[in-house]
Amino acid sequence: MDEMDEIVRIVNDSMWYVPNAFMDDGDNEGHISVNNVCHMYLAFFDVDISSHLFKLVIKHCDLNKRLKCGNSPLHCYTMNTRFNPSVLKILLRHGMRNFDSKDKKGHIPLHHYLIHSLSIDNKIFDILTDPIDDFSKSSDLLLCYLRYKFNGSLNYYVLYKLLTKGSDPNCVDEDGLTSLHYYCKHISAFHESNYYKSKSHTKMRAEKRFIYAIIDHGANINAVTKIGNTPLHTYLQQYTKHSPRVVYALLSRGADTRIRNNLDCTPIMEYIKNDCATGHILIMLLNWHEQKYGKLQKEEGQHLLYLFIKHNQGYGSRSLNILRYLLDRFDIQKDEYYNTMTPLHTAFQNCNNNVASYLVYIGYDINLPTKDDKTVFDLVFENRNIIYKADVVNDIIHHRLKVSLPMIKSLFYKMSEFSPYDDHYVKKIIAYCLLRDESFAELHTKFCLNEDYKSVFMKNISFDKIDSIIEKCSRDISLLKEIRISDTDLYTVLRTEDIRYHTYLEAIHSDKRISFPMYDDLIEQCHLSMEHKSKLVDKALNKLESTIDSQSRLSYLPPEIMRNIITKLSDYHLNSMLYGKNHYKYYP
């Protein structure tokens, strides 16, 4: 056996599969032969320069032989996941070339190095690029690097050299993304975890410089992908922290905020749908748009609010800051409709309880129907995307006295539409309905005699489950009526939530010997709500008393009358009285 046969034997013994790309031109196509053994070795083996096999390959193999697919040994070694710079240098010293030869995909060895290398070595990069005068014949190198490495750390030496040696910044992949699209993805994906590590990350200096550089080298700032996204769309869609400096860099170099993607959304619309959106960047975008293209009309503002409520499920002050800003900037009133719905209808229809709760708090009427005469309950039950409808209905019921009695009564005819997996919330809903509506249980008893009524429960929650819940609630209500609280009873206090009785309710809530299985949660909610309201009323009265002088007509009112008047104010109005424009900071 000669040494070439020995190379084939050693490589063949270690390989169980030959990829199509490595098939040779000989009779043994699909197998390892003298024609492709060097390529297989350099592509898949952990090349050890001290090994016997490596020395045989160097001695007997043609280091520049190309397969019919175009792969040279240099192509193969640059795609080796165990690539070692010292090995490459030895191969080059032994005559390996083909720096600019292309495989059947149009890739030169540098493509594979950029794609497969875990970390780009500047010296190796120079070795692979210096023999090439310019990259005009391999114009997608910059796109290749960014496409495969955008979610990790980028080498800016590599970026700038690719850019300045002729790599086309307007090359696109099969989805229409350019280098700038991928770079915008990189800024979001990689810098989220590094944002506060240093001032350079916070100020995004390197990122801004490269954005300016790539545009100066001809990148189209408004290039659109196959789904219509510009680089600004792409950046603002990412679910990570955004930098106002990056946004400004894109805007100042000509990013058009009017361009709509295939979903008919501008970059501003895409941003407002993002849970990670912040008020200061939104203000920057809107101000820039209006300075460049004119003032946004009322209907455009309503549409932005609609998109925000429908898609943005962010929680906390950041989300509410945007909501308040949009309501104020576009002067949107509580009873104002967009298409057929108010903002509150949109919130409940799209399960955005964070927004809905705030809108109810500031005075939006939960009982107001849509223009086509639908209640918020109707919107929930008509939305097929809401699987667990009882969860959302419970969020509405949670507003208790703000929900009118006719609305409560309407739920009787929707009980059969609850899912059998919703029984936790169904119990809460039915318990409150029976508390508020004395006819609820009577109506159920009456309908029980009708077999058609029972049959409507066949598809979803069972009739027996509903019947059992109503029976338990009725039993607890009888007990609630027996508990005396001053001049009334516990049942009436829970129905009216009169804060005069909050101390009595607190005593009942803290007494572990008293329990109402179907109403314990409601008692706790009412206790906390009444306690909070009582404290607000006390603070408001103290502030009012400190500002009323003896000449004021209010000073003649008896304290109990004054307290009764203040008690009728909502939490929103009390907080506004106490804290003025800063009232939103005290939103519960």
UniProtKB/Swiss-Prot annotation:
Q: Where is this region: PRANC/F-box-like?
A: 557-574
Q: Does the keyword Repeat apply?
A: yes
Show the InterPro entries listed in the entry.
Ankyrin_rpt, Ankyrin_rpt-contain_sf, PRANC_domain
Query: Do you know which SMART domains this protein is assigned to?
Result: ANK
Q: Which UniProt keywords apply?
A: ANK repeat, Repeat
Q: Where are the ANK repeats?
A: 69-101, 175-223, 227-259, 300-336, 339-368
Give the superkingdom in one word.
Answer: Viruses
Q: Record's Pfam families?
A: Ank, Ank_2, PRANC
Its annotated function is as follows: May be involved in virus-host protein interaction through the ankyrin repeats and PRANC regions.
Member of which family? Belongs to the orthopoxvirus OPG003 family.
Q: What is this protein called?
A: Ankyrin repeat protein OPG003
UniProt organism field: Monkeypox virus
